Structure formats: structure tokens, C-alpha cells
């Protein structure tokens, strides 16, 4: 029902709005995003409060973006599908407390990779096909955490089909 309400034709309402949330791994945090006025990187408590406040306004759709600390980054984006990933834990907690939400993920390596690219890099080149299994693991982990929609924002060829197969 939440997805149907979000994408219904010819009627613009609060059901069509998607609230972006930028998540950090801290329990409590509200850091301003300088390039986006009135936008913040939120800790766990602030994220849950923001979701609750938005629901009270009728906003049920959220796209969640992780802001990953450098210590969790590596060239294979291993933390992206790790069971201790704060992004996945916050998602599960949102769905537990607010099951009526529609949560949209960001499937991409760049928040988790040390080089900041959406794909594996070898000798200065993006390695498309070897990236696909990583994106698939990420998609499976995000679906298991409770995301309703998976949003692949990377630029890898064949990623959607590969993710669908994995799911």
C-alpha cells in the first residue's frame, strides 16, 4: 500500500513525497550538511525522531543514505553487507518501530570504498563484472534489513539483472 500510494498517477499529495535522510553511525548526532541548507547527518536517535515527526506530517517514504566512517571503508566495500553495518541496523529499527514506512535504499559502493568509486578499481580502471557480486550482496543485505525498494545508484552495466538474480 505504501508503494502504491507513492507512485499513483495524476495526484500530488504528501504520499508522493520522499524524505531523504543522511545517516551516521553515532548514537546521537545532528551534523549540518553545509552544501544543503536545513539538511543534517543524523545519528540513530535523531533519525528515529525525524521519521516519527515526518510520519506525523503524513510523510511515509524515506530514502536513506549512509555516511560511512573511514575506518569501515575498504576497496571491496566489505562493510556494505556486514551484519554490524549501522545503516542496516538503523533500517531494521525503523521498520520495527514504524512498519508503515516505505524505505528506499542506496545500493552503491562509493560510501563504503576507500577510493570513493562505485566499482572495483584495478590499475586505474573500473572493473565492472567483478563489482556485480558485491552489489548483489549489498542488495540482499538491504532487503533483509527491511528496505522496501532498492535504489541502485551506481553505474555498473548489468547490475539490476544481477541483483534480481541474487534476491
Q: Regions from the language model: what does each represent?
A:
Residues 9-18, 24-167:
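Alpha/beta enzyme core
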Residues 1-8:
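N-terminal amphipathic/basic leader segments beginning at the initiator methionine
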Amino acid at each position: 500500500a505504501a508503494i502504491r500510494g507513492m507512485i499513483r498517477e495524476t495526484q500530488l499529495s504528501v504520499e508522493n513525497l520522499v524524505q531523504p535522510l543522511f545517516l551516521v553511525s553515532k548514537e546521537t548526532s545532528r551534523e549540518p550538511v553545509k552544501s544543503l541548507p536545513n539538511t543534517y547527518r543524523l545519528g540513530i536517535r535523531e533519525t528515529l525522531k525525524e521519521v516519527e515527526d515526518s510520519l506525523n506530517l503524513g510523510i511515509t517514504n524515506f530514502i536513506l543514505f549512509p555516511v560511512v566512517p573511514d575506518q569501515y571503508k575498504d576497496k571491496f566495500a566489505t562493510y556494505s553487507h556486514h551484519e554490524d553495518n549501522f545503516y542496516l541496523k538503523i533500517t531494521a529499527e525503523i521498520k520495527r518501530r514504524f512498519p508503515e514506512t516505505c524505505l528506499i535504499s542506496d545500493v552503491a559502493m562509493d560510501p563504503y570504498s576507500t577510493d570513493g568509486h562505485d566499482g572495483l578499481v584495478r590499475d586505474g580502471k573500473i572493473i565492472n563484472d567483478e563489482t556485480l557480486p558485491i552489489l548483489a550482496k549489498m542488495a540482499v543485505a538491504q532487503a533483509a534489513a527491511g528496505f522496501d525498494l532498492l535504489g541502485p545508484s551506481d553505474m555498473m552495466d548489468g547490475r539490476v539483472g544481477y541483483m534480481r538474480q541474487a534476491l
